[in-house]
A protein has these predicted regions:
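Long, positively charged amphipathic alpha-helical accessory segments at protein N-termini or as interdomain linkers
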Residues: 1-3, 91-115, 125-264
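Short loop/edge segments at beta-strand edges and connector loops
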Residues: 27, 117-119
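N-terminal lobe of the biotin/lipoate ligase/transferase fold
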Residues: 1-110, 263-264
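Short, basic and Ser/Thr-rich N-terminal targeting/leader segments
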Residues: 19, 44-46, 119, 128, ...
């Protein structure tokens, strides 16, 4: 089934903000993030949106896999069960802290008022994950190139990878926005994301802190951190660090290597 991607419309909207911007759509690749990082290390630093209809070695945070299967493999009858793309862009913010939170906020604001954000890089809906973000950077000379990978569930597959039933099913955007398809979502999120990145480059995360708090999944909830700490979510600070009130006081978590889960 041929999918009509809004490549030209996205290019026309974004190129005035990012001269030299291109849009590429591939039927299959190992990972859009991996490909853009390969290009960056080879000196290719132009702004680009790279989309793959299928990723065979997609990656999430902490090395977790994100594989976008063909519809028949996932049990879906829709042309694209998940939307996976990466945006490559040179950025020079004074402080990189909070970038993944800014990206997540932009996506949630573009898509639906009920989407929530789980620190540091996930979109959730009704206590189930609907998407994730992976940000990597490459330094080439004085430039630093950011590769922002995004994966969003569009339709719920009927089976988990490997043919087993889901233990805890993720959410899909079709539950939130009935009838939406991957090309619609792509066109809806890219231009606001570029504007968000340019604002972040100029102002950092601090101006976004209050808006993030309105969608903060962990705020006020009992949390368990992968380092063993237990506490209650107290939001994020102006740098995007997670604040957790523990028995020993207020704990600030700034490392994305620490995983945090709600206990209730």
């Amino acid at each position: 089934m041929t999918i009509q991607w809004p490549s030209e419309a996205i290019w026309e909207a974004v190129v005035p903000l990012l001269p030299g911007f291109t849009v590429e759509v591939l039927p299959e690749i190992d990972s859009t993030n991996t490909e853009l990082m390969r290009r960056a290390r080879a000196g290719q630093l132009d702004p680009v949106l790279l989309l793959a209809e299928r990723q065979t070695a997609g990656r999430g945070r902490l090395g977790r896999s994100w594989i976008s299967e063909a519809p028949e493999a996932s049990g879906s009858t829709h042309p694209i069960a998940s939307l996976t793309f990466s945006l490559g862009i040179a950025l020079q913010p004074q402080d990189w802290s909070g970038l993944s939170l800014a990206v997540g906020l932009s996506l949630a604001q573009s898509l639906h008022p009920t989407l929530q954000l789980k620190w540091p890089n996930d979109l959730w809906w009704q206590d189930r994950k609907v998407g994730g973000i992976l940000i990597e950077t490459a330094s080439v000379g004085a430039l630093r190139y950011a590769v922002i990978g995004i994966g969003l569930n569009i339709h719920m597959p009927t089976v988990a990878l490997g043919g087993e039933a889901w233990r805890t099913p993720p959410a899909s955007l079709n539950e939130v926005l009935p009838g939406v398809e991957a090309p619609d979502v792509l066109q809806q999120v890219v231009l606001p994301l570029v504007k968000c990145l340019q604002r972040f480059e100029a102002q950092g995360f601090a101006p976004l802190q209050a808006d993030f708090q309105t969608r903060d999944l962990l705020l006020g909830r009992e949390l368990q951190c992968s380092d063993g700490a237990l506490g209650t979510g107290r939001g994020v600070d102006a740098s995007g660090a997670l604040l957790v009130h523990t028995a020993s006081g207020l704990k600030k978590i700034s490392s994305a290597e620490v995983s945090v889960r709600p206990r209730s």
